[in-house]
Amino acid sequence: MSELSQLIYDWNRDGRVAQADYRATELDDETLRDGLQGPSVRNPPLEVKKRLLHLMDDLGIDSADIGLPGASDQARAGIVALARETVGLRRLKPNCAVRTHATDVQAAIDASVEAGVPIETCAFIGSSPIRRFAEDWRLDGMLANVETAVSMAVKAGLPVMFVTEDTTRADPQTLRRLYTLAIECGARRICASDTVGHATPEGVRNLLAFLRDEVIAPTKATVKLDYHGHNDRGLGVINALAATAMADRVHGCALGIGERVGNTAMDQLLVNLYLFGLVDRDLTPLVEYVELVSRYCGVPVPANYPALGADAFRTGTGVHAAAVIKALRKDDRDLADRVYSGVPASVLGREQRIEVGPMSGESNVVWWLSSHGYTATRDTIERIFAAAKASDRILTDEELAALAGGKS
């Protein structure tokens, strides 16, 4: 067995100019609420949602948003069923999203009472100048709505998180007034939202530092801080990692589904936290987690999707394959998993796969033949190698088997 720590120099931890300050945080899964708001996403059956809650729990996720109770009677009934499903789980707790409207809050209260489960109520309101201008909102009216909604939920005995939408484009003065009022009314968790995917990692850090030091600290209250990100600029995962430096809980969705181009990908976030040594848990349930969401939400997984796509641990390139094959011939799976992969396949319960195509070397052909029970004769190798070089793609196992002929 190789000592991989001595074979890989990790510039991510070098520290001479920049030092990652990521931390282990709580995780909130938004797949069953914000994730389902994606315009191309289908609403999965209730039994699938229940299974997803169990997988989230298996993955060590701390909480899950199970819907908008104020949306309809059907939505509220689904929330009741899902909240009841969490009762037997080891870790996962339910929450739901409500507008800062009394009717929405009452729907959350009713759902919690019917389920017999305290459902964390996440009361949200837009906060940025552009949103306020578009809506013709006055700050005094917004503050009145916040006071009514938060006080109502707190009085009913529900844990409350107060959320501002578009926080990453809102001015400090407005944010200070909205959050401070919510805390004074009893909210014990606040959430910053990058609703339109505007933020960079620097912006996330600046915003969370402001909320921690200039909003929460002066209240002297014990208040936790959440971060909710979107992926419009392709920065969802790195922003979420940056948020862990200061946030108590970070949000994400399976496969990054959600509004427009989606949310932070929870699966990718978990893989990165694992690789940084910030979570120590079995990540093999991620395979079923993303497969269920893909199948029942109608979201195809791209072949090149990080860690979980079909091509994540697959190569037909001669140079790459040769290195992996040599590691496998040393009977060193860990070495094979890392020599040409930044994410070990074994973390996901997967394996490196050697294919044969136009970019392959002969070693690809020999490996494929031996691993599929064929004798690697010179004629067979040359026949397959010639066919691969003439092809414009990776050859399928069926095509290779036909070229290989009978096993001996």
Model-assigned labels for residue ranges:
Residues 44-47, 51, 73-77, 103, ...:
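Conserved active-site and cofactor/substrate-binding residues in soluble primary-metabolism enzymes
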Residues 2-33, 279-408:
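A mid-to-C-terminal "edge-of-domain" accessory segment
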Residues 42, 68-72, 94, 98, ...:
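Hydrophobic alpha-helical scaffolding
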Residues 1-100, 353-356, 360, 371-372, ...:
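N-terminal capping/small domains of soluble enzymes
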